From Swiss-Prot:
GO biological process terms held by the UniProt record: histidyl-tRNA aminoacylation; L-histidine biosynthetic process
Protein name, as recorded: ATP phosphoribosyltransferase regulatory subunit
Function: Required for the first step of histidine biosynthesis. May allow the feedback regulation of ATP phosphoribosyltransferase activity by histidine.
Record's subcellular location: Cytoplasm
Any single GO CC term annotated in Swiss-Prot or TrEMBL for this entry: cytoplasm
KW Amino-acid biosynthesis (keyword) present: yes
């Protein structure tokens, strides 16, 4: 057996320096959006009992979970999603809270990825859950919060696609298709494989009811703006399906009325592979990333598995994919704090330290130099992206070097503070 002490497991990643700072900035910005939209942050354990995720509504297949055992032999998992633990917390610790609950989180989730397709095994998700209301107001609030979150990060040209989990269920419930065939049908529609869909429906046409075959056959083609809803209605008389279509229509119109209609579209072929969704579902896309950067929807039956029946809706943003998109768009909108390095002679240590503390209070990144040689100080500063070098070497004015302009000046402390605050 080889020695793996210099490596990390497949699907994991070390995040260093500037990339780490950018990621933290993104997380902080999302937290601000949630906070000022009335959401309260909660934190769940990284390790949960496997039973939390092992119900008849299985969000994540068990083979996608990282499993381990505790000292009593019980199966544990690294949490594969955040919505289910929040359902557990709500059902066990929040029964007496004021509803609707508006919760938010930013946390890492873990999923086994057997395929060598570059997908991460550790993913940072940031999202919200609105718990305790059934009406479309909470669906609209969730989607609008998602749009505002992406806008706050400076992301361009994204789209939130709306679908409805109940639509597919309504169209197939009378067909009584076996579970295996149902999974196959979902996958074909999700992949918009028109040829395979027609072939599949032809093969089962003699065995099952053909009542809604026409609209099912057209589901992959039914995407675009709000006119798609009327086209879909013309293809079915299924009352449950028509209700699902009306829900999407009303949600779309509400978001349009707010003034955010340009960020949404409809995709009636959106069929989720996560079983707990019951109503409107949505995914966020941007050209620079192949997969969805955001996903969410209504899940009214999940929390009952933890002791209380409560409807809910929410979404999760993939922070790692957001970083990729922002980098490719060259639209990092995070504030870049000025960086200062202070070098000093030993007799001026206290003055240098006090000045460093003053600058930190003004949100300027500042450190005392651990090096003494001028060349070493300059090289270190350039490599680390320092903006200004300040020197405490005499009683009079302080040495100041602007590394961008390469200019040198001797200034009073208040003059330096004015310079740094520009």
């Amino acid at each position: 057996m080889g020695n793996w002490n210099k490596y990390i497991p497949k699907g994991m990643k070390d995040i260093l320096f500037e990339e780490s700072n950018i990621k933290l900035d993104i997380e902080d910005q999302l937290r601000k959006i949630y906070k000022y939209s009335g959401f309260s942050e909660i934190i769940s354990p990284t390790i949960e009992f496997y039973d939390v995720f092992n119900s008849n509504i299985q969000a994540i297949p068990q083979e996608k979970m990282y499993k381990l055992f505790d000292n009593l032999g019980r199966i544990l998992v690294l949490r594969p999603d955040m919505t289910t633990p929040i359902g557990r917390i709500t059902g066990t610790k929040m029964k007496d809270c004021t509803y609707p609950l508006k919760l938010c989180y930013t946390a890492n989730i873990f999923r086994v990825n057997e395929k060598l397709n570059g997908k991460r095994g550790e993913i940072t998700q940031s999202g919200i859950e609105i718990i305790g209301t059934k009406g479309i107001k909470s669906d609209v609030d969730s989607i609008v919060t998602a749009i505002n979150a992406l806008l706050s990060l400076g992301l361009r040209n994204f789209k939130i696609e709306l679908g409805e989990a109940g639509l597919f269920e309504a169209l197939t419930e009378n067909m009584r298709i076996e579970e295996e065939n149902l999974k196959k049908l979902k996958e074909i529609i999700r992949n918009k494989n028109y040829v395979a869909l027609k072939k599949f429906l032809d093969e089962i046409s003699l065995k099952y009811s053909k009542e809604d075959f026409e609209i099912i056959e057209n589901l992959p083609k039914l995407f675009g703006d709000i006119e798609i809803i009327e086209k879909a209605k013309a293809l079915t008389k299924n009352e449950k399906a028509l209700k699902s279509l009306n829900d999407i229509y009303n949600i779309y119109k509400s978001i349009e009325d707010i003034g955010l209609g340009s960020y949404i579209s409809i995709d009636l072929g959106m069929v989720q592979n996560i079983d707990y969704y019951t109503g409107v579902i949505f995914k966020g896309y941007v050209e620079e990333v192949g997969d969805s950067i955001l996903s969410g929807g209504r899940y009214d039956n999940l929390i009952q598995h933890f002791g209380i029946e409560l409807p809910a809706t929410g979404f999760a943003i993939n922070v790692d994919d957001i970083m990729i998109a922002l980098k490719k768009q060259n639209t990092m909108s995070m504030d870049k704090d000025k960086k200062v390095l202070i070098f000093y002679k030993e007799e001026f240590l206290r003055k240098a330290y006090d000045f460093m503390q003053e600058l930190k209070m003004k949100k300027i990144i500042c450190e005392l130099s651990l090096l003494d040689e001028d060349k070493e100080i300059l090289l270190y500063s350039k490599k680390k992206g320092i903006d200004f070098i300040i020197g405490f070497t005499r009683e009079e004015k302080l040495f100041v070097k602007d590394l961008k302009s390469d200019k040198i000046a001797f200034l009073e402390k208040n003059e330096i503070e004015d310079l740094l605050m520009v």
